[in-house]
Amino acid sequence: SSFLVEMEQIALLFDYFEGEIPEIRQDQLLIVFASHRHGDHFSPAIFDLAENHPKIWFVLSDDIWRKRVPEEFLCRTSFLGPGEEFSFQKETGEKVPVTVKAFKSTDEGVAFLIEAEGKVLYHAGDLNNWVWEGEPEEYNCRMSEAFHSELLKIAGNHIDVAFMLLDTRQGKDFYLGMDDFM
């Protein structure tokens, strides 16, 4: 679930929860995203990154409890719910224009659409077409409808990089979300 994107002036770290992170330049703005509260998408360890990165900001799904954020980082944290948008330039005075839009997940939390440095990136989090063998057809239909409803909100954006789900637990339907997105 974790991805690191390094751009010219910023670095974006998505859903970090464990493992070694490559060295990130200290002069870059580091924006750390957590799409939801599940342990494979969010870890309090993200706040330890501030030791080596004075220019750090956290963008967390609003399903992550505020009390999980250390007090000293609340002023550098934005909580986003579905349909909300955050502009770093407007809200923080950062010279690098970065805009983040949040979309409702079909599981927990949000997906992110980020515009930065002339590029558009999409991180799905757990927004997926969660069709499962053994679930009632009505459930799978509702899940597909909810997924397609969110995709319609994203449609029309020229996305340069997308981080999507391929979950083999879905059996033969593992590719549906990726296929629908493409």
Segments predicted by a language model, with ranges:
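Active-site metal-binding loops of divalent metal-dependent hydrolases
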Residues: D15-E18, H36-R37, D63-I64, S105, ...
